[in-house]
Amino acid sequence: MKAVNYYRERYKDTGIYENRLFDGIKELLSNLKKEGYITALATCKPEIYVPTILKYFDIEQYFDIAVGSELEGGARRHKDDVINEVFNQIIKLNKADNAHITNASDTTNVSDTADILNNIKADSIMIGDRKDDILGAKNCGIESIGVRYGFAEENELENAGADYIVENVQDIITTLDE
């Protein structure tokens, strides 16, 4: 437990700033927002640090939703857990956006929520640079774009079953436009 505590202390003070944005990411995020996409961050970094990281890189304004893992044995420890929480938050946004349409006493039934979730999944794509991103997407029933310019080892994205694999940020745009 001492090692875990040491790691967390170091990460909190230093580690969260040892990331970098890949070239073109800010522009990609800005364009996605301008085009009306709902953008979400699904990271296994501890959620408590996510706002700090987004602010540090000046990209918080590009995300509608940002979800991270939970510390101390929380329910969100794996990528698919994090992605599913993103879906839960999108459903809540969808219900809030449509609240004016229904009577305040009405409730959305389970089949409506399932339909909403299926529609969200059909319109979602996970972009990631590691097998956990790709496998998390598969476990959640959504497509994935594996990016080679990240941290994946050779053939990692292919072996994980990425639906698309791109070499650079521009290729992400091309893939999304297809």
Put a short name on every predicted segment.
Residues 1-3, 50, 124:
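Small-residue helix-packing motif on alpha-helices
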Residues 1-4, 22, 26, 60, ...:
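Short, structured helix-loop boundary elements
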Residues 3-12, 61-66:
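Short, basic/glycine-rich phosphate-binding loops at helix/coil junctions
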Residues 9, 13-41, 47-51:
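Short, acidic loop-to-helix structural element flanking the phosphoryl-transfer center
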Residues 20-24, 45, 129, 149-152:
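Short beta->alpha linker loops
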Residues 30, 54-178:
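Asp-based, Mg2+/Mn2+-dependent phosphohydrolase catalytic module
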Residues 46-47, 69:
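Short "lid" loop at the C-terminus of a central beta-strand within the Rossmann-like core
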